[in-house]
From Swiss-Prot:
PROSITE patterns: GATASE_COBBQ. Catalyzes amidations at positions B, D, E, and G on adenosylcobyrinic A,C-diamide. NH(2) groups are provided by glutamine, and one molecule of ATP is hydrogenolyzed for each amidation. Keywords: Cobalamin biosynthesis, Glutamine amidotransferase. The keyword Repeat does not apply. It comes from the Bacteria. The active site is at C329, H436. PANTHER family: COBYRIC ACID SYNTHASE (PTHR21343:SF1), DETHIOBIOTIN SYNTHETASE (PTHR21343). Pathway: Cofactor biosynthesis; adenosylcobalamin biosynthesis. Residues 251-444 form the GATase cobBQ-type domain. The keyword Amino-acid biosynthesis does not apply. It comes from Chloroflexus aurantiacus (strain ATCC 29366 / DSM 635 / J-10-fl). This is Cobyric acid synthase.
């Protein structure tokens, strides 16, 4: 017997679908259900690596954690990673498939439907409940013929489907009623109710709005979910960086350069959650003023990012910067002396001089390193605890001369190893490595912050589990009767 599917679709991108699925996964887990998330297709450069070295969207991995299980590629069989220049790398079942333009992908999309159904069927045979997430809007009419992620999934699974709208962006009636109007009759029959998300203020003030929605749609409003600040969960898309949360007026400032095709920017969430630390995403060298450190993040297209840095005037600004400079993955490659792409792995190929802040050279190859990784930092301030993280990269970087490595890798996947990674300048001010997630290691993160002059709070700040906090918030808005209906087996 196949498990039922509960599906969440939204009126647009960024209305809270991923967050709601995360909450529902935790609520189902707390009820003793074996539950798994599913998103047929995701578009994001924020990726996670599974235990068997495959890529899925970071948001899906977060949902799996909320469900109390390890993430697998079945939960996100298709991942689209924008590369710039109107091309994207298509990851199918965790491995690179093709680098395609949007037109090429559209023409070849139909052959991926069997990938979607095979993986969804596997989850339904393994778990008690699957909670699926759509993408964008289910009624982009010009895109519906190629749909493999929204209502086609709902129809295939005969999923009980929730429609979510974001009242904070305005136009909630047009969002929800307009979407329902544009659904096909057989699709509309699958909608079990609507959720009004991100309401600021007392939800009871929207009582008339609930009545209007229910009378005009003929469907129940399952809940009005109030705005919740500081979720403590990774954002899925780089659009979140365009509207950063209000930061404290003072504190230790860490500048992160908002490079084109920025990837895995959730690397820096643990820094932002430390009391007295301000993470500021910047686009211009003048914004380096007052920063104790600057970080170059991962990117999907390193050579394009290098040209962007030069055009924006960051070359001299970074060479003259007196604080700490860090590069993670693609950012590490940018800190070196030369970047070469002889096989056009990133698209157009070519080579460029790096920033020249570390004595390394990077050469791109077609082999892609995707592993969960354990390493030891080769610096005294990092402590002796092994560092947990992951690698996702296609280039290999080679240190020149006697330049010291920053990390010693001791395990990739389940295989013990011994390999150097990264590089650090002779004065310790500039360093970089390929290890994503490095700042999630508490001893390492706080050791580095102390070097920058950060003073930890005298009394540790207690933080509630973000999954339980989110789940409690959503449960209070929906109520037990609605949750019972949504999670019936």
């Amino acid at each position: 017997m196949q498990a039922p599917v509960l599906m969440v679709v939204g009126t647009a991108s960024s209305v809270g679908k991923s967050t709601l699925v995360t909450a529902l996964c935790r609520l189902a887990y707390r009820r003793g259900l074996r539950v798994a998330p599913f998103k047929a297709q995701n578009m994001s450069n924020n990726a996670a690596v599974t235990a068997d070295g495959k890529e899925i969207a970071r948001s899906t991995a977060v949902q799996a954690a909320a469900a109390g299980i390890a993430p697998t590629v079945a939960m996100n069989p298709i991942l689209i990673k924008p590369e710039g220049q109107r091309r994207s790398q298509i990851i199918v079942e965790g491995r690179p498939w093709q680098s395609l333009t949007a037109t090429d992908f559209w023409q070849r999309k139909a052959q991926l439907w069997s990938v979607v159904t095979r993986n969804l069927d596997h989850l339904r045979a393994t778990y008690d409940l699957v909670i699926a997430e759509g993408a964008g809007s289910p009624v982009e009419l010009n895109l519906k013929p190629g749909d493999i992620v929204n209502m086609r999934v709902a129809r295939y699974a005969q999923a009980q489907t929730i429609l979510v709208g974001d009242i904070d962006r305005g136009g909630i009636f047009a969002q929800l009623l307009g979407t329902l109007m544009l659904l096909e009759p057989e699709e509309r029959q699958l909608i079990t109710g609507c959720i009004v998300n991100r309401f600021r203020g007392d939800p009871s003030l929207f009582a008339d709005g609930v009545t209007i929605l229910e009378e005009r749609s003929g469907l129940p409003v399952l809940g009005v979910i109030p705005w919740l600040d500081d979720l403590g969960l990774p954002e899925e898309d780089a659009v979140a960086l365009e509207q950063p949360p209000v930061a404290p007026a003072h504190g230790l400032i860490i500048a992160v350069i908002r490079l084109p095709t920025i990837a895995n920017f959730d690397d820096f969430d643990p820094l932002a959650r430390e009391p007295g630390v301000v993470v500021r995403y910047i686009d211009h060298p003048l914004e380096l003023t007052g920063a104790a450190a600057v970080i170059l993040p991962g990117v999907k297209h390193t050579l394009a990012a290098r040209h962007w840095l030069h055009e924006r005037g960051f070359d001299n600004a970074l060479r003259e910067f007196t604080g700490a400079i860090v590069g993670i993955c693609g950012g590490y490659q940018l800190l070196g002396e030369r970047i070469s792409d002889p096989l056009a792995v990133e698209g157009s190929g070519g080579e460029a001089a790096g920033l020249g802040l570390l004595p390394i050279e990077t050469i791109f190859t077609t082999a892609k390193q995707t592993t969960q990784t354990i390493a030891c930092a080769q610096v005294p301030w990092a402590g002796n605890e092994p560092l947990q993280g992951y690698e996702i990269h296609m280039g290999q970087s080679y240190r020149r001369g006697e330049a010291p490595a920053f990390l010693r890798i001791i395990q990739r996947g389940n295989t013990p190893t011994s390999a150097d990674d990264g590089c650090i300048s002779s004065d310790g001010r500039v360093w970089g490595c390929y290890l994503h997630g490095i700042f999630a290691n508490d001893t390492f993160r706080r050791g580095w912050l102390r070097r920058l002059g950060w003073q930890p709070p005298t009394t540790p700040v207690a933080r509630a589990d973000p999954f339980d906090r989110l789940a409690d918030h959503v449960a209070a808005a929906l109520g037990p009767a609605v949750l019972d209906r949504l999670m019936r087996r």
